[in-house]
């Protein structure tokens, strides 16, 4: 598993957007990745310094469409905190604001 395969996508919610002001970024990551591997991947991909990594395993949820039931697959979420002297991660690019 390469470092570029670990981070799948950023999680964009109201809470995660508010945490970006405190240099905390939320990503969906590979479920087999551990904290040290996530730290190495974020530092390599975004060229920043990571202070800490918190991980959460989100359980699968059951969903219904009419009479049919199915499951929405679970995933692993990582909240990455950057150091104070590190630069910000530009998720949306420069033209977003």
Curated annotation (Swiss-Prot):
GO cellular component terms given for this protein: ribonucleoprotein complex; ribosome
Function: One of the early assembly proteins it binds 23S rRNA. One of the proteins that surrounds the polypeptide exit tunnel on the outside of the ribosome. Forms the main docking site for trigger factor binding to the ribosome.
Subunit structure: Part of the 50S ribosomal subunit. Contacts protein L29, and trigger factor when it is bound to the ribosome.
Any one GO molecular-function label of the UniProt entry: rRNA binding
Designated name of the protein: Large ribosomal subunit protein uL23
UniProt-listed InterPro entries: Nucleotide-bd_a/b_plait_sf, Ribosomal_uL23-like, Ribosomal_uL23/eL15/eS24_sf, Ribosomal_uL23_CS
Disulphides: none
Pfam families cross-referenced by the UniProt entry: Ribosomal_L23
Lineage: Bacteria, Bacillati, Bacillota, Bacilli, Lactobacillales
Key words, A-Z: Ribonucleoprotein, Ribosomal protein, RNA-binding, rRNA-binding
Family that this chain belongs to: Belongs to the universal ribosomal protein uL23 family.
One biological process term in Gene Ontology: translation
């Amino acid at each position: 598993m390469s470092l570029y395969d670990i981070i799948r996508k950023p999680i964009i919610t109201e809470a995660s957007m508010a945490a970006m002001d405190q240099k905390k970024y939320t990503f969906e990551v590979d479920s087999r990745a551990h904290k040290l591997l996530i730290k190495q991947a974020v530092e390599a991909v975004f060229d920043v310094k990571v202070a800490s990594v918190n991980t959460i395993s989100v359980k699968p949820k059951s969903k219904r469409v009419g009479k049919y039931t199915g499951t929405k697959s679970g995933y692993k979420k990582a909240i990455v905190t950057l150091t104070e002297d590190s630069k910000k991660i530009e998720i949306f690019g420069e033209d977003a604001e």
